[in-house]
């Protein structure tokens, strides 16, 4: 199995939703890892620069046509691109990932996209509220009873989260990937959730 984590970035993607996960993959609290267990790779519709909501431009490692068939995880980063026709090109990518038992993460509108195409019908899940999942999903979303009102949920290799849950999303994926020990992942989560001053006892 490849050790690459593939991040799907559509035009106007939400850059902040990548940060906690990708940083923990590539570094520890002191420096870049010399031999990381996984490697971050950006995937976009083409090899052209893809722009974030905030205006940052990312040069992708792969396009939809050149991305590998084997990888460790597929992560759908939220943003406004999921409401556009280009998002439909991601349907077979996700379908293949689920069929192969790959780890799939989807946050914010990425989770709504999953609902729209019936990918959440066999798992417990969350997202930007049940109403949005039903609005996006229509008749294809048949599992509202599986919705959990939580920041992030992991079930059967699928992790979903709402757009405010970037840290919780990262935590669930890091645990599923076994990127570090559960204790170190919890430490990373608490440090970023609580903040240095609170954890160090300083005012």
Put a short name on every predicted segment.
Residues 53:
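A short, charged, and often flexible helix/loop element on the N-terminal side
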Residues 2-14, 20, 27-46, 56, ...:
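Active-site-adjacent pocket-lining segments in enzyme domains
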